[in-house]
């Protein structure tokens, strides 16, 4: 298929074909991605490694004067975005490491990696041969089995432990996911992985209906681990609202709104809180604490930015109209009160004027 496409489009190049060896290097054997690096080395300034089922959406622009040894690109799937290193300077000995969720590495170290920002994203569609025709939960359950075996061979590999927890979570094995995330959180290492592990522990405890103090404590632990991330506060606002505690929900929503979307983090940024969720939570409960103008502003901004799903439009519009009526009533009452006060002042002036004349 690739040869035919190249011929039809008159694209020059070389095609290498070999048996599948796994994604990355493991157990002393090179993986297929490493083999691809070896075949491509020196044949272009940079090499772009991309899965055949992924697609580039938006306006991607490669730097005009590239200087980094590798570039990290923004990925998106569902409600999450993350960064993955995919473009590599082709004069180094790059290789991939790991049986699953492999990562690139190179010698000699150190090497420079930059991010490519812009209005684009790589859509990770997971439509490869090993995923076609099976339920996603089954796919991730299989991944978990592979990672269980990998950990037996390499028990100190923190990346394996993290993605084992991820695979349990994505296959809806909540108890196993909770235990695996807890294990990963104790191993230290990359702060973002530790944060996300503790955050997901709170999510698992929520799904498993653990006592509220445990859930609350875990969300707060994740927030304390990385206070530059708003996701834990968003979840606390949402859960407090759902359980009839609007004042607490308001406080957490206000805190969450003060945290901008992180630009330096690379691991699984949950977009909903930053794009519209925090505003929505504030708009949903501001009336309960008498903050009608703030609720109106939140709903107005939501509607103007229009980042929420269509399924939420009717509810958000209803909240907006309700706030409009309340604020209009308050302003009208204030206007009437101001008129009454002005009239009182006029009457007082008249009385004082008469008293002054009588005194003379």
Question: Which sequence ranges carry the predicted segments?
Answer:
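Short coil turns that delineate tetratricopeptide repeat
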Residues: 155, 189-192, 227, 261, ...
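Catalytic-site signature of metal-activated, phosphate-bearing donor transferases
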Residues: 24-37, 46, 54-179, 189, ...
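Acidic donor-binding segment of Leloir-type glycosyltransferases
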Residues: 1-17, 251-258
């Amino acid at each position: 298929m690739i040869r035919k496409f190249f011929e039809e489009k008159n694209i020059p190049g070389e095609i290498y074909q070999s048996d599948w060896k796994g994604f990355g290097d493991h157990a002393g054997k090179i993986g297929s991605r490493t083999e691809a690096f070896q075949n491509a080395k020196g044949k272009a300034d940079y090499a772009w490694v991309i899965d055949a089922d992924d697609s580039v959406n938006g306006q991607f622009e490669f730097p005009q004067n590239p200087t980094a040894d590798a570039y990290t690109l923004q990925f998106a799937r569902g409600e999450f975005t993350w960064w993955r290193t995919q473009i590599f300077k082709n004069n180094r000995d790059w290789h991939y490491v790991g049986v699953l969720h492999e990562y690139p590495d190179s010698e000699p170290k150190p090497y420079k990696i930059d991010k490519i920002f812009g209005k684009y994203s790589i859509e990770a569609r997971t439509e490869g041969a090993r995923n076609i025709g099976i339920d996603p939960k089954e796919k991730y359950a299989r991944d978990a089995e592979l990672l269980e075996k990998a950990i037996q061979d390499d028990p100190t590999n923190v990346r394996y432990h993290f993605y084992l927890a991820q695979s349990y979570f994505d296959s809806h094995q909540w108890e196993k996911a909770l235990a695996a995330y807890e294990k990963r959180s104790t191993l230290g290492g990359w702060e973002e992985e530790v944060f996300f592990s503790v955050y997901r522990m709170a999510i698992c405890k929520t799904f498993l209906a653990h006592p509220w103090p445990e859930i609350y404590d875990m969300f707060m632990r994740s927030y304390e681990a990385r206070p530059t991330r708003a996701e834990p506060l968003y979840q606390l606002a949402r859960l407090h609202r759902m359980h009839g505690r609007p004042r607490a929900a308001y406080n957490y929503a206000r805190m969450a709104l003060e945290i901008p979307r992180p630009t330096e983090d690379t691991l699984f940024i949950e977009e909903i809180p930053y794009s519209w969720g925090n505003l929505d939570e504030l708009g949903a409960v501001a009336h309960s604490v008498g903050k009608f103008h703030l609720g109106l502003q939140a709903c107005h901004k939501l509607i103007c930015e229009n980042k929420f799903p269509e399924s939420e439009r009717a509810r958000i519009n209803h909240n907006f109209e309700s706030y409009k009526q309340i604020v209009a009533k308050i302003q009208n009452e204030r206007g009437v009160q101001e008129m009454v006060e002005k009239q009182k002042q006029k009457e007082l002036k008249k009385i004082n004027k008469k008293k002054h004349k009588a005194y003379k």
